[in-house]
UniProtKB/Swiss-Prot annotation:
One of its GO terms (cellular component) is cytosol. It comes from Homo sapiens. Residues 129-178 are annotated as: Tudor-like domain 2. May be involved in the regulation of cell cycle progression. Exhibits H3K4me3-binding activity. Residues 210-255 are annotated as: Tudor-like domain 3. Belongs to the SPIN/STSY family. This is Spindlin-2A.
Amino acid sequence: MKTPNAQEAEGQQTRAAAGRATGSANMTKKKVSQKKQRGRPSSQPRRNIVGCRISHGWKEGDEPITQWKGTVLDQVPINPSLYLVKYDGIDCVYGLELHRDERVLSLKILSDRVASSHISDANLANTIIGKAVEHMFEGEHGSKDEWRGMVLAQAPIMKAWFYITYEKDPVLYMYQLLDDYKEGDLRIMPESSESPPTEREPGGVVDGLIGKHVEYTKEDGSKRIGMVIHQVETKPSVYFIKFDDDFHIYVYDLVKKS
């Protein structure tokens, strides 16, 4: 996890041209193996931190310690040590074993479960979920960058936010999409339009993939190992995958068209 060179103001949604999202535009994906995790037994159950505000340090290799704050969105049922976290100023959702990853330092609970935010328009929320969309971001010099993607679900805890992924970058992001829709920066693509990679016909959905380990071969021939951790309800062929060497959550359609 690297600190972005410059984080945008909270809530501002901009992308550098061909870059990543707000706050993570300059963030490098670290492809390093996680350190051996501590396996000390616990004499009592851990406190449920889902919905809590947290802070912690982050130490990777010889790099300086950086400080992070965020909200714990969810605990992954198939791997209870893995949590999904929305960090302040970062648009990607991260998956971290907060209690076991040795790079996480001095984990603190800043507050008890935060009050769930409410959406302003439930009907509009239901309209955009599961849809292929075009999402406009402010690029360099005030230009507009168009990103095609799919709205996956309403985010847990932070209910005014939505999970979304993109053709250009198939990892899990979250934004306040209703505001973008009302401002004309989010457009639902017509059903007849060419669908993004995650938009597949519903037939042939594979059951029982949750918890399965997967292997991905990169262009250089090296392999990555990960686990399927979630199935998208509105698009059952689409799954979340957490790779062992990365804290991003990847979104893939695991059912090929015949």
